[in-house]
Amino acid sequence: MIKKVGIFQDLKSAFACLFSWQDIDEHYVIKLFGAKICKKHKYNVDLKPLTELGVTQEKRSPHLIVSLTTFPARINLVHKTITTLLQQTLKPDMVILWLAEEQFPNRELPASLTDLQQFGLSIKWCEDIKSYKKLIPTLREFPDDIIVTTDDDTYYDSRLLERLYNSYLERPDCIQARQAFMVKRDFNGEFFMKARSYVYNSSYLPSYKNEPVGCGGVLYPPHSLDLNVLNAKQFMQELPTHDD
C-alpha cells in the first residue's frame, strides 16, 4: 500500500520531531529539540486503610503474582503503593516486594511496611540488580506463573489487575501493558520512541515494536520472555538502568 505525502506532511513531521506536548496517563510529556521532560500531575489521593486480606485464598492456576521493588530513599513511602495493590477488585495470589540485601544490611524496615505482611505482602531479599529487581527474581522463582510488575511510587486504580488479567485472558500469548513506547522512524529514517497510552482496549494490535512502560503496570504471561533476560551480567552491563 502506498500513500502520497505532500510537503506539508513532511514539514509537520519534522516539527513534531523537534517539539511536541502530550498528556499521558497523569504525566505531562514535553519533547523539545530531542530532549524529553516527563512530569507527573500533582493531586490528592484518599488512601483508604486496609481492612481485609489483599491476596486471594482461592486456588488459581497459573498464579497471578504482583512484583515490585524499592530502595532506601523510598522505603518510608512504598507502603502507600503496596496498599493500593492490596485493595484490588481482583485479588492476586501474591504481592512480593524485593529488597536488595546490600541496601538494607541489617534488614531494618519501617513498621508502616512490615505491618502490611498481615494483609498478604511478602518481603523477599535478593542481590542488587537495581530496578530489574521488580521482575527478574520473581521470574526465576515462579517461571510458570503470571507476573505483573509495578513501580513503587504510583497509586494504582483498584481495577488495575482486573483489567490486565481480563486482557490477558483474551490474548494469553501477549504481554499486556497500560502504557507503551512504540518504535517508529522519524523523517530521517532513524528509529525513535513515541509515547502512547493504552486503555485496556483489545483493538490495539500486538506488535514487537511496542515497549511496555513499567509505571502503568505490565503483565507477563508464563514463558513470554526469552530465558536470556535472566542473564544479569549482560543486562547490567548493557542496560543497567532501563528495566523496561
Language model features by range: what are they?
Residues 144-155:
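Short beta-strand-to-loop acidic/aromatic patch adjacent to the donor-nucleotide binding site
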Residues 237-244:
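Acidic donor-binding loop at a coil-to-helix junction in glycosyltransferase catalytic cores
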Residues 157-234:
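Conserved catalytic core of nucleotide-sugar-dependent glycosyltransferases
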Residues 76, 126-134:
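A short, glycine-/small-residue-rich helix N-cap motif at loop->alpha-helix starts
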Residues 31-87:
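N-proximal low-complexity "stem/linker" segments adjacent to membrane-targeting elements
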Residues 81-94, 101, 115:
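Short, acidic, metal-binding catalytic loop of nucleotide-sugar glycosyltransferases
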Residues 135-146:
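Active-site nucleotide-sugar/metal-binding loop of Leloir-type enzymes
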